């Protein structure tokens, strides 16, 4: 119950700073899953993510003496915005370390919220590398390190999301699905929800490409991943920490892993149907609904949409990954005879009525009888692939599909 009390105190500290975000019903998803699906809209915070809660609660709880020391943090973007906002509001200077992969939009937002009080340093290719540099710098300067998740005050601040969910539903909820990166949000929300009603099922949703919490819980110890996929940058963490690991092990019922293509599909669906722009990490919880579909029928389910700081310039890439995941986009290396009418035959005899060529380029210009071309084809349905392959064989095309492990494929997708 100590975390419950800490979260109650954090809520008072955050009054007038963090918004009480709405639980938005989704008619589309409720009909799809035969349940009442509510979306906790943390993208509607001033900094467009839940991170303002933990960052402000931590910094505002510093003693007068500690406030005189330099504040240091590391972040993939959203925590940095929360720290910048808090420091500007409290008049405290900060040095913020961010990975070099951080989207420009997030860097600019940090500059906007922090103003002259915040210095940004771009270091490392992942959160973990940036964090190591930040902690070393903090030790040199004898500063206060505001960790994005490995801190009880930060966790308590994030846990106010759980308090708002509980208060808004009077505890009458069957399941809460929370995204997991480092685990600060999940451990805070789960601590409060389980502390008030142990019967509520809490599910963590983590990227399949960076499953640090999943592997740690599976092995019963903190596991550091050798490699991670940083596409879902807001949740790309190589190693969780002891505090969040302990709380998640105690209060989170299980963790499901989501492939990036599934997350991209959720992002596209949210934009097309609800007009919601979310970042990849923000879509994790909603992406997990298929994994729990059978057990949530006729129940109330809350999915935490944790943030909306997404650069719209990423949407072409997001759509590409979604189409590949759905089996609707495929790439081939095709050898065409260098004679008139060969491409016309391919279009007329191989492509179906709803198949589209979305990319075509000769890999190498040649005077030989045959030339290889890279061809991208978009299908209306994944079931259209087999008929396409059969028609290509019938006209005796020499072709091969590009596999996901190939370097050229990774360049395209």
Predicted segments, located by residue:
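PLP-dependent amino-acid enzyme catalytic core
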Residues: 1-413
């Amino acid at each position: 119950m100590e975390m419950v009390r800490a979260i109650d105190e954090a809520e008072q500290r955050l009054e007038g700073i963090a918004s009480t975000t709405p639980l938005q019903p989704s008619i589309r998803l409720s009909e799809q899953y035969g349940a009442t699906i509510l979306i906790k809209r943390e993208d509607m915070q001033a900094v467009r993510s839940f991170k303002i809660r933990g960052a402000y609660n931590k910094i505002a709880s510093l003693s007068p003496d500690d406030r005189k020391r330099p504040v240091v943090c590391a972040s993939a973007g959203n925590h940095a915005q929360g720290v910048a906002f808090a420091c500007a509001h409290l008049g405290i200077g900060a040095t913020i370390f961010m990975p070099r992969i951080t989207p420009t939009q997030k860097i600019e937002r940090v500059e906007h919220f922090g103003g002259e009080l915040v210095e940004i340093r771009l270091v490392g290719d992942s959160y973990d590398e940036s964090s190591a540099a930040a902690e070393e710098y903090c030790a040199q300067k004898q500063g206060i390190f505001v960790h994005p998740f490995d801190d009880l005050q930060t966790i308590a601040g994030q846990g106010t999301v759980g308090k708002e969910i509980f208060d808004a539903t009077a505890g009458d909820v069957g399941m809460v699905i929370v995204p997991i990166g480092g685990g600060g949000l999940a451990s805070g929300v789960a601590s409060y929800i389980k502390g008030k009603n142990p019967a509520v099922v809490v599910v963590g949703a983590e990227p399949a490409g960076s499953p640090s919490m999943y592997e740690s819980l599976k092995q019963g110890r903190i596991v550091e991943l050798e490699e991670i996929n940083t596409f879902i940058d807001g949740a790309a963490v190589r190693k969780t920490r002891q505090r969040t690991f302990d709380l998640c092990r105690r209060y989170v019922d299980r963790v499901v892993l989501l492939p990036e293509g599934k997350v991209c599909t959720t992002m596209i669906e949210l934009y097309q149907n609800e007009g919601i722009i979310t970042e990849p990490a923000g879509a994790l919880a909603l992406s997990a609904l298929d994994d729990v579909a059978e057990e949530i029928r006729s129940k109330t389910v809350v999915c935490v949409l944790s943030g909306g700081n997404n650069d719209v310039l990423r949407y072409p890439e997001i759509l590409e990954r979604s189409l590949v995941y759905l089996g609707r986009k495929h790439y081939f290396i095709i050898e065409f005879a260098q004679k008139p009418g060969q491409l016309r035959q391919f279009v007329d005899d191989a492509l179906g009525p709803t198949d589209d060529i979305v990319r075509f380029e000769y890999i190498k210009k040649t005077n030989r009888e045959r030339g290889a071309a890279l061809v991208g084809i978009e299908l209306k349905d994944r079931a259209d692939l087999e008929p396409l392959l059969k028609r290509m064989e019938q006209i005796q095309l020499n072709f091969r599909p590009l596999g996901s492990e190939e370097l050229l494929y990774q360049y395209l997708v």
